[in-house]
Amino acid sequence: MSGELNGNDTSAQAAVSAGSVLEGAAFADEGEQHNESMKTLVLGALGVVYGDIGTSPIYAFREALHAAATNGILARSDILGVVSLIFWALTLVVTVKYVLFVLRADNNGEGGILSLMALVRGALKGRPDLILGVGICGAALFFGDAVITPAISVLSAMEGLEIVAPNLTPFVVPAAVVILVTLFSVQKLGTGRVAIVFGPIMALWFVALGASGLWHIFDDPTVMAALNPYYAVRFLTVSPAVAFVTVGAVFLAMTGAEALYADLGHFGRKPIVRAWLWIVFPCLLLNYFGQAAFILSHGEAAALPFFQMIPSFALWPMVLLATAATVIASQAVITGAYSVARQAVQLNILPRLEIQHTSEKLHGQIYIPRVNLLLGLAVVILVLGFEKSSNLAAAYGIAVTGNMLVTTVLLYIAMTRIWNWRVSRALPIILGFLVIDMLFFSANIIKVHEGGWASIGIATVLVLIMWTWVRGTRHLFQKTRKAEVPLDLIVEQMAKRPPTIVPGTAVFLTGDPKSAPTALMHSLKHYKVLHENNVILTVVTASKPWVASADRARVSQYNERFMLVTLTFGYMQQPNIPRALGLCRRLGWKFDIMTTSFFLSRRSLKASVHSGMPLWQDKLFILLARTASDATEYFQIPTGRVVEIGTQVNI
């Protein structure tokens, strides 16, 4: 026995040393400095980044055991094999792949699938559509994850009621629906005030996870033998068919790992990595090994081991804490969905959406009504349709494994094109990640009939919408460009036949500064007047998240009547044209909002059989265009200074 204890002590020391080595490797090239204290950032990361993966122990181990059981019977080797798989999956996927590699692929400090796509496209000549397509698929899978996470998380917490009081079982689904409806209803109020307590609550949650697991490890300390990969390999090889299905359930322990990268811009790399290595990872392992030891010594407890191993006096507090943790996890995913939607709009992957800022101090705190409504409806429908978290498990895995697979593909391009790694160095690493990702993805894709269809259906609809918008805007641009007249030609004609000059400044928005804006053409045609000063304004979205105010505006004088202005925003920034034009004062143009009129073109689109797209896609694009947020609101232009001129375009 003393030999075992000494061995465990050595393992613990080795784990701490490994943590130090990993942290040192993760920060080998770290140079960022944070204004806030590290402790505050780590605590914040616990509340935002790790809510999803932190609530996985409620259902992940249970689902993996159900998959591993043969005729409802679990052998000791099965239990050790499953917990060993979870340990090594968390180590290889989260600690190695995400902590050591993916978190390095930041786009000016920002992370997430669309940030990575923008980074990679910017590094490739011609910005190939293939990369855009991969990014769109990744974004669609992320939204699928955002729908499933609140549903499965809150449902799994509510299922704890079945242990506390079996007579409350019929109220599990209604209670989950009430909590979720309330959660989505209060989004418009902002999360600034309640977010302060997210970190402490999740810190308490991880302490509870670790403590409950550590207590039950002593039920059967030999469970720690599962740290040896032998048990994982043996489980995979003895019964490959059963193991393959089990791998799909084991992946549930990794759901939420993508949040480490998605929330990179909120906290920075160092706090996220430290929170994982020193708090989240150890507490998760203690809980999973504790559940395994509990089942080894209480074989009948495999139904809901997470709650069954909690002492009766602590059951109600644990159910309440689990509910709070799953709500926080859901909130983090909802906030992430807003952020990704805003990025997609800025990158012209989605139509303009109404974006409301819920905080005067923190610009990142936003609320998108349409996204909130659609997300809330989809989540409630899933809860009512699937009723149990076990039924949602299959749908969950496909969305997250697909997202991770896309991340790996883009990471390879970042390694070879941005980090300038040799292929011989990058390829072995990426192939290792791809083997793991493909194993998890294939193990989940076979569950289409069990609920995976929901994930695939959500992602397919979103890919269709985003790709239709991308294709449609391109066709519309090409169509209108053919009909437009070069600005040079219009200026020459006005020099020969000067129109009536009226006082003030006119700003014409256009996507192509070389062509005369449609609004300008119609103004000259119908009113025969030209303002004293005319600005041809182009708004550009950069491939990086933030553009400094000093780099916001470029101004060039075309002639005495015309000026060309280009405003550049990052894809994480909300365009504010009046404020940006105010920056032009230092460039020599004294912008005055009270003497300026903004001329916008409002296009009425008609479907055409010669558009280059199928007729159904034309109609879908027109529908999306009609639902787009008003340009005046999106660009934050005062409505009293706007003149809209309508045109009809056949696409």
Swiss-Prot record:
Protein's UniProt keywords contain Cell membrane: yes
Domain of life: Bacteria
TM segment ranges: 41-61, 82-102, 130-150, 163-183, 194-214, 235-255, 276-296, 309-329, 366-386, 395-415, 426-446, 450-470
Pfam families for the chain: K_trans, K_trans_C
One Gene Ontology term of the molecular function aspect: symporter activity
GO cellular component: plasma membrane
Compartmental location: Cell inner membrane
Protein's job: Transport of potassium into the cell. Likely operates as a K(+):H(+) symporter.
Family affiliation: Belongs to the HAK/KUP transporter (TC 2.A.72) family.
Name this protein carries in UniProt: Probable potassium transport system protein Kup
Organism of origin: Brucella abortus (strain 2308)
